[in-house]
Amino acid sequence: MDPIALTAAVGADLLGDGRPETLWLGIGTLLMLIGTFYFIVKGWGVTDKEAREYYSITILVPGIASAAYLSMFFGIGLTEVQVGSEMLDIYYARYADWLFTTPLLLLDLALLAKVDRVSIGTLVGVDALMIVTGLVGALSHTPLARYTWWLFSTICMIVVLYFLATSLRAAAKERGPEVASTFNTLTALVLVLWTAYPILWIIGTEGAGVVGLGIETLLFMVLDVTAKVGFGFILLRSRAILGDTEAPEPSAGAEASAAD
């Protein structure tokens, strides 16, 4: 047995519920809570109005995710879907998490780029369609329907990522080098991590079943923590989110530019 599967099996045995993914859901809950409280402490006493908006949004992201992970840890937000002769465990609570948290992440980026409300509404609307169609695919009973909805969801994701990499990136560039550097770093993170989600879906238990539920849950947990807590850490340490009254550490991109 490989080390990851062995660790999951031991965790399931210790927790007494027989679910190999429970250990990773527990760790995910803990990491999301740590991220939430870290952002709260970091933002305590911040007076800049614009910075407070970013903190409020960014704190909500791991906060919502921690509630979703805790519910999955206790077996809530879990259902069984029969696909042919096989019964699949589907964590629909994960999609509920994404339905709330991914628009908030996009809102952070939209505020950073200072785009108009129509652009924000379009971005969030396509994102919501991406999540809902992904959930429909996960709950479908035939392989054809599942893969069709997966493709629909993936196309929506490509539209969102294209919008970030073109229109929003251009708008962020107009706001100066600090904003552009932070936006580009965060967008690169989103592009890499979000692209991994449909790949994991297609090779996981909801798709081809190449990897088991325990490993799938571990990988989703790593992606979620990085996409939420990692995103927030980069954003909230940047000068780009502040007015002239306060200034945390510069972004990594700005530091590199200064060194040159």
UniProtKB/Swiss-Prot annotation:
Residues 7-20, 74-91, 140-143, 205-212 are extracellular. Keywords: Cell membrane, Chromophore, Hydrogen ion transport, Ion transport, Membrane, Photoreceptor protein, Receptor, Retinal protein, Sensory transduction, Transmembrane, Transmembrane helix, Transport. Its main location: membrane. The modification N6-(retinylidene)lysine is found at K228. One of its GO terms (molecular function) is photoreceptor activity. The chain crosses the membrane at residues 21-42, 52-73, 92-113, 117-139, 144-172, 177-204, 213-245. Residues 1-6 form a propeptide. InterPro entries: Arc/bac/fun_rhodopsins, Rhodopsin_retinal_BS. It comes from the Archaea. GO terms for biological process: phototransduction; proton transmembrane transport. One of its GO terms (cellular component) is plasma membrane. It is found in: Cell membrane. It is a multi-pass membrane protein. The keyword Endoplasmic reticulum does not apply. Residues 43-51, 114-116, 173-176, 246-260 are cytoplasmic. Belongs to the archaeal/bacterial/fungal opsin family. Light-driven proton pump. It may interact with bacterioruberin in the claret membrane. This is Archaerhodopsin-1. It comes from Halorubrum ezzemoulense (Halorubrum chaoviator).
